Amino acid sequence: MLPGRLCLVPLLLALGVGSGGGSGDGGDSRRRRLLAAKVNKHKPWIETSYHGVITENNDTVILDPTIVALDKDAPVPFAGEICAFKIHGQELPFEAVVLNKTSGEGRLRAKSPIDCELQKEYTFIIQAYDCGAGPQEAAWKKSHKAVVHIQVKDVNEFAPTFKEPAYKAIVTEGKIYDSILQVEAIDEDCSPQYSQICNYEIVTTDVPFAIDRNGNIRNTEKLSYDKQRQYEILVTAYDCGQKPAAQDTLVQVDVKPVCKPGWQDWTKRIEYQPGSGSMPLFPGIHLETCDGAVSSLQVTAELQTNYIGKGCDRETYSEKSLQKLCGASSGIIDLLPSPSAATNWTAGLLVDSSEMIFKFDGRQGAKIPDGIVPKNLTDQFTITMWMKHGPSPGVRAEKETILCNSDKTEMNRHHYALYVHNCRLVFLLRKDFDQADTFRPAEFHWKLDQICDKEWHYYVINVEFPVVTLYMDGATYEPYLVTNDWPIHPSHIAMQLTVGACWQGGEVAKPRFAQFFHGSLASLTIRPGKMESQKVISCLQACKEGLDINSLESLGRGIKYHFNPSQSILVMEGDDIGNINQALQKVSYINSRQFPTAGVRRLRLSSKVQCFGEDVCISIPDVDAYIMVLQAIEPQITLQGTERFWRPAAQFESARGVTLFPDIKIISTFAKTEASGDLRATGTAPKSAVLEEMLHNLDFCDILVLGGDLDPRQECLELNHSELHQRHLDATNSTAGYSIYGVGSMSRYEQVLHHLRYRNWHPTSLETRRFQIKCSELNGRYTSNEFNLEVSVLHEVRVSDTEHVNHLIVQPPFLQSVYHPETRSSIQRSSVVPSIATVVIIISVCMLVFVVAMGVYRVRIAHQHFIQETEAAKEAEMDWDDSALTITVNPMEKHEGPGHGEDETEGEEEEEAEEGMSSSSSGSDDSEEEEEEGMGRVRHGQSGTSSQRPERSTWNTAGVINIWK
């Protein structure tokens, strides 16, 4: 049938054309429609629905099923072909294209890359169109409408981001939380796979926190406010494609303390700069009571310094200097001095040299030499000491002797002793029969906890027999037990005074020490015939550091306070917490030493609370802090002055002698670092040290004699005692030197040193003496340089004619005495620089040699030449006789003016010259008379005479030359 129909098409077309040839265009179109209707009988056919997938950022759509349109008019040209696929919808990003008109195959594609985040899926209508009856798109037939559903496939292009840049939470210490807070992140991808957050993670390590997949953060252990008050952790997030967050978020967790009663806002370490005065310790402290019903409060601040020196920071001057500083009476005897040549009995003891603390280990004792302490202490005397002692070893401990005066041999009697027995301090004093013959008090016992507390305490025993009083740390204690005894029978046995043990001279095969002391002692002294006052005792044991209160008048009402004697403990009481807080903020630390001991001072604050009608009251923990005393600036003490000078021998022999240090200066400096330089050029400030002068005290200056001790038979060092006393200093003198001691300013020591003199009764055998000065502050803690002085003696030397080997240097007898007048200032300069005198002497001798050489040829010419020389130098007159000639060359001696007797001398010289030239046989008598007459006017030595005078003037001369070295 189909081939038959195709055969009819040309026929029908021919008929249509023939029949309608004359009716116009309307007839033609009607005929074409009729023809098409007969040829394009069927509509294209497609599936009713399509499902497709397109990948994000791509244009290819994968459809299921594929687009294929069928037309039953095929294979008729145009009518059986598919010409187009059309999509119905507004602004759809897709288009459908025909791949093959005959087969009807098509393809759906995107006009531009698809963004899933804008739209995840699309639904639209599509229809297929055949080609109709011809190429003019006439009579196209379209298929039914098919539904196309396209889903956009997502790409994981976005990373998770947190909703908040930072999170903050507050937790209470001591609790475990299921969730402290929740962090949340989002992802802008469109698919569930890439847009959902599948995991959270804590980036910060070693923190007591964990996080779950939902972002909930919890703590894994109990948090402590005291251990750490804030935590900062970083958290990241992952989407289900395991892409991490672009930026981590910060989570800050603050730990809030559980309300605990106690002191708040105080600093554990407190630094103290030396010289800063009184420094507040708790400027911001306050008490947290947690709403407790507190009725009253007692606060105790304790400065713990028992491990420093002798219990606290005290002046480290020598015991003699401290006694002098505190105004103690003279006559103190130091039983534990620093080891030296004069005090060698402490050389074998264990000692802490920095503080002069002697340690006794139960095996040591020291014998005090005879004569150090008088045998009769009288009824009044004082014993002082620093002692540190612990519990006695053993159940029945034996006596531990501190000081003992016992028989040296034969017997074992104790005349007086101070010892510790079972933590009791006992003082024994046995009178002799010649002092008393009745039953008298002999042993005095004190029972104090401080004796065995292993801490330093200052003990003073004042004896005014029969009353004995103990002062410990400034407080007075009466003996709890006094036992009586008979006086000691008189004997001629010598006594032995010991420290650290008692000497057992009798009742044993060999005398030995016994009853050894275990502990530490310092500043053990005894003062016979005098009791010490309470003021001096307080001064000697006073601490230079302690607690203080700034502005006592500003303390709140109802505040009571109390200091212990050393100001190391302060107790404050009150019923108002606010007033207590203000009062405690005014508590300060002060150290009055210019050079305090550096180191730690522990500080404890304890509290006692009473509450209103409460069975259980709050408990306030102690505050443990410490004060760090920084190192003080160390001074550099420098001695300056003349290091060498010369003095005439007569001055050494005079009553006042020679002043050794007339211009000495004592200067103390310290190095101060300052920033300098060009900051713009270097970027940093270089530091330079600048010396600045500082003022402080000295405690001794030693003047040592170098090159051998002084010979007391012919030399000594002298110093007026008034110079010392008016400056509150003392001194000791020996053949080894002079020692000035006492706490005083550097200017006081300068003034005293300016008056120190050296005398020598026989300086003829002395050429030089050398001395050395060395000064100290704080008992040798800071010492000066060693200043050396050399003193030389200017001697008068006599030279006779027999000592001249070369007779050309002997002055001829016709030369008169020559003077070299100089002023006093020249003499003073020459005393310092003796080389000037030597130069003048050499020049004078050369002149004389020249004159003698000329005189050999012609006496007249020599005489005239000498006159010219003497006129030029304004010298003295000459004599022509053969008698002895005196020549004095002393450029350092003060002479009369150059014009004295000048005219008269010149006239006489001319007359004598004429007489000598006219007749050589005029006799020696006249010449001798003239010479004696001239020498009577100018004479500095003794002249001798010649028994015979040769024709050509043979000279025999005896001369004296005074030379100051």
Curated annotation (Swiss-Prot):
This chain belongs to the protein called Calsyntenin-2
Which residues belong to any copy of the Cadherin domain? Answer: 46-162, 163-282
Give the encoding gene's name.
Clstn2
Give the family, as the similarity comment puts it.
Belongs to the calsyntenin family.
What UniProt keywords apply to this chain's record, in alphabetical order? Calcium, Cell adhesion, Cell membrane, Cell projection, Endoplasmic reticulum, Glycoprotein, Golgi apparatus, Membrane, Postsynaptic cell membrane, Repeat, Signal, Synapse, Transmembrane, Transmembrane helix
Species = Rattus norvegicus (Rat)
**Do you know which Pfam families this protein is assigned to?**
Cadherin, CLSTN_C
Q: Hey, what's the signal peptide range on this chain?
A: 1-20
* Translocase as UniProt keyword: no
Family annotation (SUPFAM superfamilies): Cadherin-like, Concanavalin A-like lectins/glucanases
